[in-house]
Amino acid sequence: MSAPTPPQTGQFQVATSAQRSPVAVNIVNYLFQNPILKQRTGLLDNTNDIEFFRFKRLQRALLSDDYKQKQQNPKNGLIPVANNEDVQKVFVLLIQNQLLLPLQKLHYAEVKAVKGWKPNKEKPTLKRADKAVMDPDVYYGWLYQKPNPYILLYSFLAIAGVFAVILFPLWPNFMKRGVWYLSMGALGLIALFFATAIVRLIIYIISLVAFPKPFWLFPNLFEDCGVIESFQPVYAWEEPKKKKGKKKKEPKLEVVEEKVGSSSGDVKVTGSELSNGSSTTGKRKVTLEEVEE
């Protein structure tokens, strides 16, 4: 199956398909998590995680020597891409199979203007764009999750674990003793954790009276971090909270909700709707717009 040929006009409509073609899936398997894309994790509609990248990175990945080398192997099922025209064909193919979602990156003020949304320092907030534009700096996100190659192994281990628990009465005595020692060790660690939490709380209460600044033992113990980071640093002094000054009122930005549908003869692109971490597919038309560099 070859990639569709886009018309020569600036805007054109592409009908999407609910059934994904093997060629499109093979291309996405190559592109997904490709280092050339430099893809990052963002928040779609300030809720769901989505991997996104710029269109120019997609062009570079498809025109790279690595892609040409992988394409020569018939097992990979990749179609040849020689120039920007071929890149556009692949791009249209991915849009048709609902594997790409055009996105718009929001600024801090735009996120704050939406009721219920909160800016995230680590993950930028994104929303669906009206059109899929072939512009180098336009953002696109993946509507695809690469299948886990170890899923069968995990399933087998889970079944083996269930049978091992069921057959516990038939275990030899040395295995039963080993499980007992392990369980006692785990309970000891849990008891030590609670004891540490109680001791640090007592020290903190005493420091409120005895010292000018409150003292914390293991200040990151209950923070959202790794096990080792929870015990680093060993101690810290709590800094007093700064009083917030009066801020000037910023003009409110008008928020306009996006609608998927046709307007003045153009059909807007949103890709698949994502809600509560799930995606739904359906047949609809897509408007693609080329921008001359």
From Swiss-Prot:
Which stretches are Lumenal in the membrane topology?
172-185
The cross-references to InterPro entries, in alphabetical order and at most eight, read:
Sec62, Sec62_asco
Gene Ontology biological process terms in this record = post-translational protein targeting to membrane, translocation
Q: Show the Pfam families listed in the entry.
A: Sec62
State the annotated membrane topology for this chain. Multi-pass membrane protein
Task: Tell me where the signal peptide lies.
Answer: none
Region labeled Disordered — which residues? Answer: 240-293
Q: Which UniProt keywords apply?
A: Endoplasmic reticulum, Membrane, Protein transport, Translocation, Transmembrane, Transmembrane helix, Transport
What intrachain disulfides are recorded?
A: none
Q: Where is the composition biased (Polar residues)?
A: 272-281
Where does it reside?
Endoplasmic reticulum membrane
Question: Which residues does the entry place in the Cytoplasmic compartment?
Answer: 1-150, 207-293
Asked if the Swiss-Prot or TrEMBL record annotates the protein with the keyword Transport, the reply is yes
**Listed NCBIfam families:** sec62 (TIGR00869)
Known partners and oligomeric status:
Part of a complex that contains SEC61, SEC62, SEC63, SEC66 and SEC72.
Family affiliation: Belongs to the SEC62 family.
Instruction: Return the protein name.
Output: Translocation protein SEC62
